Amino acid sequence: MLRTRLLILVGFVAALVPGVALGFWLHDEGTIDYKRGSSTVEFVTTQKKPEQKRPRAVVLRLPWPTYGLRVQRTHTAADFDIRPPYRLRWTFKAHHVLEFPPSIAYGRLYVAQQRGRFFAVHHRTGKIVWQRRFDHCSASSPTIAYRVVYHAWMQPLPCNRFPRSQPGMITAMAARTGKLIWRFDAGAFETSPLVIGRTLYAGSWDHKLYAINIYTGKPRWTFTADGEINSSAAYSSGKIYFGTDAGSLYALDARTGRQRWRAQALSRFGRREYFYATPTIAYGRVFIGNSDGTLYAFGASSGRMLWAQRAGTYIYTAAAVWRGRVYVGTYDGYFMAFNAATGDRLWRFSASSAVHGAPSVIDGLVYFAACPACGSVASRYSKQGARGTYALNALTGKEVWHWPDGVFSPAVADSQHLYIVGRSRIFSFAPKHRAHPARQEQQKPKRKKQGRRSAARSDTTSGTPAPGTSARR
């Protein structure tokens, strides 16, 4: 009899535990991760704003010199007057996956495909100016400074077949010729380098953030974090910010490498998920998404958590910041805008697939891509559908334009052209109704005839305006 009662009790407990665990999980998912912020606490509006324009000479020479455009990684370009409808100018084939977008300087696009080929592509023709082959994989954007291209590399080829302890490297190449200037060997790098002054910063799978002399390729200092670093470093007011796979966000003194503060993601059952996303610095705050689907705002000076907003199943994308709004996408197929001060959601757009790569705000439109394969083996929901690039009105979230290719971080630009990054191709677009400034005077006498020829060619224009919307809204 006693044995029977014990068996019944054990069975009851066994049935109860999963239910209790599920209850905790749902409670944790639904309520714990939300904290509303305030515009009166560590919200700085007197600093240089993300949408502030740069000097014209800088825009022409270095239109998009690094991942996220600026050292704060804001992914916002206010310098360009580029909107649809577009005319397709050229297509460049990289022959393998382009996981990160190119950087643009000196009239060239600099980009690496996943299997070790690095290209310099002419911005007007789409032709290869030079290329190099390396025996390492790539999942980052280069950064360009002082006519040198710096790029970080992961483990040796073939990709994803070596343990994560395999070595990586950073290379410095002459922007004009591609000549190798120096090479720094360390752990594998899945981060886009950042150059501040004479120092390059990059985080590695070996848990270290390296500060490297850009002239010699020798380390100035090294900081050891609590986990792998996939998050590219961002800079503001003398500090370097980055996240780790252990769920920590660090702020270091850029000159000395000394830790200024460390913040952490909220935990579930005693563990934290990771910060794969690159932090974005604006308004005296650090905005960063966690792989648990939570978007955070931390004080850039204090490290204090100011707000935390539940956004979706996973966040791998860096955020873009523009006019008091924070833009981010999730693996359950939503793209959203949040109030930068409070964390309140302003609008939400449903895409065809998971959103994995960083958005870009260009001339009031926010561009992002839908990734059909991202998260296909994930434990939480990941939306599977068609791939493509969306352009939404950044104020309202209404769709303005669509392009059928695009998987990761799809859009960069210079003063004349928009570049959309597909799975393995780059597409160059120009606005249909604007002549090139260098030829504008020559074209004036032939405006009517040229207009008719342009109209005849408009059938070749790619990209789809959204029904019932104006591209200028």
What residue spans do the PLM features occupy?
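Conserved core beta-strand positions within WD40 beta-propeller blades
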Residues: 63, 108, 148, 199, ...
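Extracytoplasmic beta-rich repeat domains
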Residues: 90-103, 131-146, 152-169, 180-196, ...
